[in-house]
């Protein structure tokens, strides 16, 4: 029983020790997520203890990419993490960029089309589509694009348009922390000579 415990400790120590750096080596031993490594441990126990560096190189080199250290393993880092962290936020950002800024800017356009003449609508279509955050007073005289509001007609009756209109014409606010003049710099003062210490003061210090 003691020999099996000693053998298990040796196997664990072989994987726990950091390996010397060499080209193509990531510098970190991680095989807990790989099924092939656990099978190879059972098959090649003796070879693993005798030559851990060579066995590790032959087993680890294919899953790791050439650019270095990956703490969670190659397959876990490249497949699972992008699905969770990148695709869902992209769908939210696409919805926020396309629906929220564009639709409030389209409501005043629909109201103005009945009042203003139509000739300049098609010329300003690209600039209004790509820059939806322009102030509304600049958009009103140009009469942009009658075509785009049709796909978003269910989205048009939104209440956030009314609070946005009074906020845009406000003048820029003064800075929250105004710069104050710095105090005058003190001129360099000459150092006074130290008074000569007599023997009584030296004795007190000692």
Swiss-Prot record:
It is found in: Secreted, Extracellular space, Extracellular matrix. This is Amelogenin, Y isoform. One of its GO terms (cellular component) is collagen-containing extracellular matrix. It comes from Homo sapiens. Residues 1-16 form the signal peptide. Plays a role in biomineralization. Seems to regulate the formation of crystallites during the secretory stage of tooth enamel development. Thought to play a major role in the structural organization and mineralization of developing enamel. InterPro entries: Amelogenin. SMART domains: Amelogenin. Residues 128-142 have a biased composition (Low complexity). It comes from the Eukaryota. One of its GO terms (molecular function) is structural constituent of tooth enamel. Keywords: Biomineralization, Extracellular matrix, Repeat, Secreted, Signal. Residues 118-180 are annotated as: Disordered. It holds the Pfam family Amelogenin.
């Amino acid at each position: 029983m003691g020999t099996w415990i000693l053998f298990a400790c040796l196997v664990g120590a072989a994987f726990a020790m950091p390996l010397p750096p060499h080209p193509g080596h990531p510098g970190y031993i991680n095989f807990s997520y790989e099924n092939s490594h656990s099978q190879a441990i059972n098959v090649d126990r003796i070879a693993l203890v005798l030559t851990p560096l060579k066995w590790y190189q032959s087993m680890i080199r294919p899953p790791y990419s050439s650019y270095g250290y990956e703490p969670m393993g190659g397959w876990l880092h490249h497949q699972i993490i992008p699905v969770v962290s990148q695709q869902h936020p992209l769908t939210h950002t696409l919805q926020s960029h396309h629906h929220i800024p564009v639709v409030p800017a389209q409501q005043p356009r629909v109201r103005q089309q009945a009042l203003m003449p139509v000739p300049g609508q098609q010329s300003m279509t690209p600039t209004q589509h790509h820059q939806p955050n322009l102030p509304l007073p600049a958009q009103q005289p140009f009469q942009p694009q009658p075509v785009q509001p049709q796909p978003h007609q269910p989205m048009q009756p939104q209440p956030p348009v009314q609070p946005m209109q009074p906020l845009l014409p406000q003048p820029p606010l003064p800075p929250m922390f105004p710069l104050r003049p710095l105090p005058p710099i003190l001129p360099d003062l000459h150092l006074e000579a130290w008074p000569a210490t007599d023997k009584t003061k030296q004795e007190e210090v000692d």
